[in-house]
């Protein structure tokens, strides 16, 4: 509740970082395919049906799905160990959210984090290596459609999936830039017989988000 108030994020679900696959499997229904995706090098957030309704009412209000993910950097494993030492008990699940105010771009510079996140975070952990580009976590959803086999749908292509190219059925004579819409924005560059999708940018309703949108286009082109 405190985190939602500080981030101005009243209703959107949070993701859960699970210590390992066994912990994630205790929380949500995971098929073999979903487990493979969770453990792949893309390490996405997987939206899956919760095994116990209302287990985390503050995390996923209004939905019966939970977004679970596994650690994708060594520091996240160390954070689990550090939390365990502080609380003197095993910590298997952490609530995850991005470093930003709702509807603003992700913060990836140390100086910006100090300026804008100091009133939200109790502590800031950073590295002396500069982060060049911010990128959201990718989100996949596990769905069972009637009697068919389970399908994994990409809800947000970002970390781990971009800037990989996608094939086109034919080549284009002239390269083109597709800039998308104002909401849930993503841009794409079309060249030859390939399309290069940017990572998820988000809504462009905030001035900072629009400037970030322009920076992504410049990087892509």
Where are these regions (language model features)?
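Active-site-adjacent structural elements in enzyme catalytic cores
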Residues: 1-221
């Amino acid at each position: 509740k405190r985190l939602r108030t500080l981030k101005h994020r009243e209703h959107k679900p949070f993701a859960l970082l699970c210590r390992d696959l066994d912990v994630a499997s205790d929380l949500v229904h995971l098929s073999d395919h979903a487990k493979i995706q969770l453990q792949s090098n893309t390490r996405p957030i997987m939206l899956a049906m919760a095994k116990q309704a209302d287990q985390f009412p503050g995390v996923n209000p209004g939905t019966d799905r939970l977004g679970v993910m596994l650690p994708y950097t060594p520091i996240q494993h160390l954070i689990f160990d550090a939390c365990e030492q502080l609380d003197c008990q095993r910590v298997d699940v952490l609530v995850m959210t991005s470093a930003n105010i709702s509807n603003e771009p992700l913060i990836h510079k140390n100086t910006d984090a100090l300026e804008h996140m100091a009133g939200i975070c109790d502590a800031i952990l950073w590295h002396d290596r500069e982060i060049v580009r911010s990128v959201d976590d990718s989100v996949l959803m596990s769905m069972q459609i009637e009697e068919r086999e389970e399908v994994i749908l990409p809800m947000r292509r970002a970390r781990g999936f971009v800037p990989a190219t996608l094939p086109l059925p034919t080549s284009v004579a002239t390269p083109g830039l597709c800039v998308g819409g104002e909401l849930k924005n993503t841009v794409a560059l079309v060249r030859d017989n390939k399309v290069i999708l940017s990572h998820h940018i988000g809504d462009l309703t905030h001035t900072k988000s629009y400037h970030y949108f322009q920076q992504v286009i410049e990087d892509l082109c």
